[in-house]
Design a protein with these regions (language model features):
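Short, compact, well-ordered microdomains
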Residues: 45-78
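A generic structural signal for beta-strand entry/edge sites
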Residues: 2, 37-39, 55-59
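Conserved short hydrophobic interaction patches
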Residues: 20-24, 73, 77-80
């Protein structure tokens, strides 16, 4: 499943996305937890989630259940 998250300059939503990924146990494959421009991979017990950020937007892709959990956490603040 793929989902658009926010505009690239929506830093509040980007922060909520990173918090949700951490809360769900995601391990970032990169050297930095920041979401700079590019493709970022996060590993979870239930699979891998990718986050793509460019100059215009941020989106995620991964297993349906995992993407749904992330969307729930960033949209209304519901915690696991």
């Amino acid at each position: 499943m793929r989902a658009d998250i926010c505009a690239s300059d929506d830093y509040d939503t980007r922060d909520r996305l990173l918090a949700a990924l951490g809360e769900l146990g995601g391990a970032h494959d990169g050297d930095s937890e920041a979401l700079g421009v590019g493709l970022h991979r996060f590993r979870f017990p239930g699979g891998e989630l990718t986050v793509f950020a460019d100059a215009w937007s941020v989106d995620i892709e991964g297993p349906d259940a995992l993407v749904q959990q992330v969307l729930q956490l960033i949209s209304d603040g519901t915690r696991g």
